[in-house]
Amino acid sequence: MSWQAYVDEHLMCEIEGQHLSAAAIVGHDGSVWAQSESFPELKPEEVAGIIKDFDEPGTLAPTGLFVGGTKYMVIQGEPGVVIRGKKGTGGITIKKTGMSLIIGVYDEPMTPGQCNMVVERLGDYLIEQGF
């Protein structure tokens, strides 16, 4: 299965009538493996900040999490495993695997829990597969 198929079929899939607004699979070096059409362009410093927060949990909390120039308030995640952010009625979930970052962006009516489930389920599967 191609990386694009993982984005299209596993991240952008419909869940309880809803789906993510944007999603991507990105290497730890910031290279985009696959993304939805609506996913914003990631800046190198944004990826560096995300990786740093996984290595040193809490570093993004004071400044916020930036993805494609959009600022998200960092909310409770799983230190070193999952970063979650909130912006208005939407938000973001980022799951770190051994080689990649699985990123899902959502807006209402999708719920944070639905986003977390979609992103973390694929992340857990890729970890099991060695990615």
Swiss-Prot record:
Phosphorylated by MAP kinases. Disulfide bonds join 13-115. Keywords: Actin-binding, Allergen, Cytoplasm, Cytoskeleton, Disulfide bond, Phosphoprotein. A motif (Involved in PIP2 interaction) lies at residues 81-97. The keyword Methyltransferase does not apply. GO terms for cellular component: cell cortex; cytoskeleton. The keyword Disulfide bond applies. Expressed predominantly in endosperm but is also found at low levels in all tissues examined, including mature and germinated pollen. It is found in: Cytoplasm, Cytoskeleton. The modification Phosphothreonine is found at residue 111. One of its GO terms (biological process) is nuclear migration. It comes from the Eukaryota. Signal peptide: none annotated. GO terms for molecular function: actin monomer binding; proline-rich region binding. It holds the Pfam family Profilin. Occurs in many kinds of cells as a complex with monomeric actin in a 1:1 ratio. Belongs to the profilin family. Binds to actin and affects the structure of the cytoskeleton. At high concentrations, profilin prevents the polymerization of actin, whereas it enhances it at low concentrations. By binding to PIP2, it inhibits the formation of IP3 and DG. Has a high affinity for poly-proline. This is Profilin-4. It comes from Zea mays. The gene is PRO4.
